[in-house]
Amino acid sequence: MEPTSGFAEQPGPVKAESEEQEPAQWQALPVLSEQQSGAVELILAYAAPVLDKRQTSRLLREVSAVYPLPAQPHLKRVRPSRSAGGAQSSDLLLCLAGPSAGPRSLAELLPRPAVDPRGLGTPFLVPVPARPPLTRSQFEEARAHWPTSFHEDKQVTSALAGQLFSTQERAAMQTHMERAVCAAQRAAAQGLRAVGAVVVDPASDRVLATGHDCSSVASPLLHAVMVCIDLVAQGQGRGSCDLRSHPACSFTQATATQGARAGSVRKLDEDSLPYVCTGYDLYVTREPCVMCAMALVHARIQRVFYGAPSPDGALGTLFRVHARPDLNHRFQVFRGILEDQCRQLDPDP
């Protein structure tokens, strides 16, 4: 089917400064990878109390040479502790233990003459974090078991605390999601599934495409996300969907700068289109499915904001496609913008 010209976007009314309002109560929460959001995995290790602190440096050097722990560089080898009498003491991490490990003596664990065990007490088993903590909550959980180094991602910490976006950014995000909600309502009026989506260029805050679910028995793949990606392509002189029967689906013609950028990005292969959504944001009322999530990977979207989760969602519920390390593109995902409104549009079955 030949691409159509679509319906040109008209700029919406500009609010007077006195009409600026605080965004409604919602949180844009990051949807992190399974490694970032999961519980701390623990493995067993052997440690021993340091009975003579004057031997600590030597013991640390000798034990580290025999058991360097290259896969666990986050683990600190010495843990402050207190003796039975309350005096300050320390424990030395010796080596990892198997899952069915039992009590072992110093002679069994530390080979002579590489390690002189003088100054060490009886070894004991202790759970330690298997991998470096990636978030502050993981760090707090990890260090409750054993001292652990932590290289904090300030952006993730701010996002988890709800402090990543300014009031002005939140207001713009709410406006874009409200536009997606309106598109979903227009879809419902046509007897279609009430899911709406908007693609925005964050560099200019310009709306590039507005769409809604157009799927039917004849066209089962026209989910809101797929429609929006095609509309962005139509704005760049590409695209393949005839959406003239859906007046709420519209796009903005690409500017010369956008067109040059779209035409200059490298192609997937000789017969494929350029990446049409490089650097863009998507707002969608419902969490995308696997098909739509993979389409966003191929389109090179930058960020996705969705209102309500979906039972078959692929950006947080069933899968986290956006964070898979084996894919050649990853993007940020946030959930919860106007969640109540979005959930009411298309209630869960």
Swiss-Prot record:
Q: Which residues bind Zn(2+)?
A: 223, 289, 292
Instruction: Tell me which Pfam families the record gives.
Output: dCMP_cyt_deam_1 (PF00383)
- Family annotation (CDD domains): nucleoside_deaminase
Residue numbers carrying N-acetylmethionine: 1
For the biological process aspect of GO, one term held by this record is: tRNA processing
In the record, the note on similarity to other proteins reads: Belongs to the cytidine and deoxycytidylate deaminase family. ADAT3 subfamily.
**How is this protein named in the record?**
Probable inactive tRNA-specific adenosine deaminase-like protein 3
Species of the source? Mus musculus
Lineage runs:
Eukaryota, Metazoa, Chordata, Craniata, Vertebrata
